[in-house]
Amino acid sequence: MDVRVVGPDDWADWRLVRQRSLTEDPEAFASSVTMWTGDRDTEANWRSRLSSPGACFIAYDGSTPVGMVGARPTDAGVELISMWVAPEARLRGIGGGLIDAVIGWASGSRLSLRVIDGNAAALTAYASRGFVLQPGCADDEGCRTMLRLT
């Protein structure tokens, strides 16, 4: 497994893994596949997404994209977003590698994320890297907040 930071020139790989994540595991995201298909499915839109402030990472098995995660700056630090690992690549440490890439990129900044309430696999992966579920109910999108306490 190889985790790489990606940019606008990697738009086709990001498109592949993002659309796959939203198609195969729609319940894991507040976003939907319709936000990234149809009229919005253009090279310009994908390049723009990968040009936004922050960083995007793809996990590769050989040359095949099998996971993704993003990191974006916020007023309070950095937010980990859009984490996903392909079903055939799960339980191989890829999720941990993607989380570690964001932790390294954030370089000591306060890290937060939102996770769909009840997503046990994601909660376990995040907890293994020091994230703690915050008190309170799920938001309007069914998400709970986790913070990384260092």
Locations of regions flagged by a protein language model:
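A short beta-loop-alpha structural element at the N-terminal edge
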Residues: 2-17
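Conserved beta-strand in the GNAT
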Residues: 58, 64-72, 77-84
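Conserved GNAT-fold acetyl-CoA-binding loop/helix
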Residues: 23-45
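Conserved acetyl-CoA pyrophosphate-binding loop and the N-cap/start of the following alpha-helix
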Residues: 89, 93-101
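C-terminal "cap" of GNAT-fold acetyltransferases
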Residues: 112-150
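A short, internal acetyl-CoA/4′-phosphopantetheine-binding micro-motif in the GNAT/acyltransferase core
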Residues: 60, 83-90, 115-118
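A short helix-loop-beta-strand connector motif used in the catalytic cores of GNAT acetyltransferases and
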Residues: 47-58, 79
